[in-house]
Amino acid sequence: MFRGKPNSIETLILQATDEKNTKEKWDVIMDACDQLSSTSGDVGRNSIKFLNKRLDTANANIQLLALTLTDAIVKNCKTSIVREISSRTFTDSLLKIASDSTTHNRVRSRIAVLVNEWAEIMKKDPNMSLMQDICEKIRKLDIVDLRAPKKPEKEAMNELELKREEEELQYALALSLSESTAQSNKVENPQSTKDEPLQKTNQRQESNLATSPASTVSRVRALYDFAATEQGELSFKKGDIILVLESVYKDWWKGSCKNAVGIFPVNYVQRVVEPTIEQQRQSAHMEQQVFDALPQIDELLDTLSTTSPDAADDDALQGKYHAMIALRPKLVRLIEKYASQKEELMDLNERLLVARRDYEKLYEQSMSEMRNF
């Protein structure tokens, strides 16, 4: 009736999928992959069954971490272990979770994307055909669009389009200046402007990129992976943030991503919508709520460290616990927000260092030529 003590691999699975994890523990994940690849017989099979149980839970964080671990297993473990991932039991679990409308949208989307990748990896092995079948069924659920669009042709911009690009740039600069002035006035008169400017800003931000000049867009987010096939193209992964520099062709823009510069197709990205003033206010309020709760968290930890197990049913203690647990989604969103900002700032720092290095090199060359005269 009761399971025995978890084996070493199951312990690693528990550590890698712990609901308290705020990010993937890749050292634990790769250790689990190494140990799985060195097993034989029922140990590996039972470990995958244990992973399946972690996946089949109501906790979205555990599910996402279990999917990350599963992805690492598919891409790093030996064939006999990967075949366990494509077993009837495991694939049925994936389909059940993806089909359940009560499953968190991030989990459903993650399953759809990963199953599509796994089906591609396993398609050459007839013993893993179940993953192909499940992939087709999940595609029909239409959770996410997995089909990357066709790359557009590199058509040169005509004079009319170049003129429009310049006009839009001047308009964007003037609009930015007027909004800056309006924002200064709003600080002095907070009741003078409200919903209308925000609605106009949102409408402008959400316009179709296909008809938007690059001069009106500062940042975009990748919707699909894009692998450069020609010199000068910019490779990126889905979710990457790209700084838009200029239009090069009709449907291709030049941009910078992770210290690389190149052109990319506009239909592979979407505009990064900047938060409105109201959204910024709400975000700041949520962040303050989390920091204001720090003393309560410390108080709960102190209480738990000195309370006997018999007090677990205490209503006051349970109330404090559930109040703190309710903060976790907000905390996770804040972590994601600042992780993204950190990545963008590090990318910006790298580009500034390159620019500084190039400038200093150019300056030294110039000074050297002057000294030779």
From Swiss-Prot:
Domain SH3 residue range list: 215-274
Bilayer topology annotation: Peripheral membrane protein
Gene Ontology BP term (one): protein transport to vacuole involved in ubiquitin-dependent protein catabolic process via the multivesicular body sorting pathway
Keyword annotations of the record: Endosome, Membrane, Protein transport, SH3 domain, Transport
Intracellular or extracellular location(s): Endosome membrane
UniProt GO cellular component terms: cytoplasm; cytosol; endosome membrane; ESCRT-0 complex; fungal-type vacuole membrane; Golgi apparatus; nucleus; prospore membrane
Record domain UIM: where: 164-183
Major localization class: membrane
Skewed-composition ranges (Polar residues): 180-192, 199-213
Region called Disordered, residue ranges: 180-213
A Gene Ontology molecular function term of the record: ubiquitin binding
InterPro entries per the UniProt record, alphabetical: ENTH_VHS, GAT_dom, SH3-like_dom_sf, SH3_domain, STAM, UIM_dom, VHS_dom
Keyword Membrane: yes
VHS domain location: 16-146
Function of the molecule: Component of the ESCRT-0 complex which is the sorting receptor for ubiquitinated cargo proteins at the multivesicular body (MVB).
Record text on subunit structure and interactions: Component of the ESCRT-0 complex composed of hse1 and sst4.
Family as reported in the entry's similarity comment: Belongs to the STAM family.
The protein, known as: Class E vacuolar protein-sorting machinery protein hse1
Species in which this protein is naturally found: Schizosaccharomyces pombe (strain 972 / ATCC 24843) (Fission yeast)
Source species taxonomy: Eukaryota, Fungi, Dikarya, Ascomycota, Taphrinomycotina
